[in-house]
Amino acid sequence: LREAGIQAPILILGCTPSFYGKELMQYNITQACYDLSYAKALSAEAQSAGGTITVHIQCDTGMTRLGFLCDEAHMTQSAQEITEAVRLPGLHAEGIFTHFSDSDGSEEYTMMQFNRFLDIIQKVKELGYEFAIRHCANSAATLLYPATYLDMVRPGIVLYGHFPDRTMDPGL
């Protein structure tokens, strides 16, 4: 995309091996950072290249894939680890995000995830770090839950004219 002249911000939500740190810096691509060991690996790559990698901290509030765990049992530890990660040399922690696992289905579960996300943001803030960008709204949440917009939304499939769930009423 960069070689084609695209200058808009690019955020990789998946995992990029840390040895591609130079490319992340060269092309000014923001990388999701899902745990402290990955943050340390990205930091080492950035330092060895003499640059800075921009990251968004990924929080697992209930999707159970990648991210700092944000359930009640792990909230305090994750807040401490996130705070350590954002202070590593060579990293610029611009944002923090989570992903809703069922925002086109369960309002109760989506709101539980949203509240966990707000809790981790607050705990990290209490430890002295505030993120410029907070985001969690995927396609379904963009359509159904305006309260979850925060600083940015991530519509995906709706950009192609499809609804996240075939049973959703488009309301048109």
What are these model-predicted stretches?
Residues 38, 116, 141, 154-157:
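Hydrophobic side chains within alpha-helical segments
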Residues 143-172:
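Active-site loop ensemble at the mouth of alpha/beta enzyme cores that anchors a bound cofactor
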Residues 2-135, 149:
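Active-site-proximal beta-alpha core segment in soluble small-molecule metabolic enzymes
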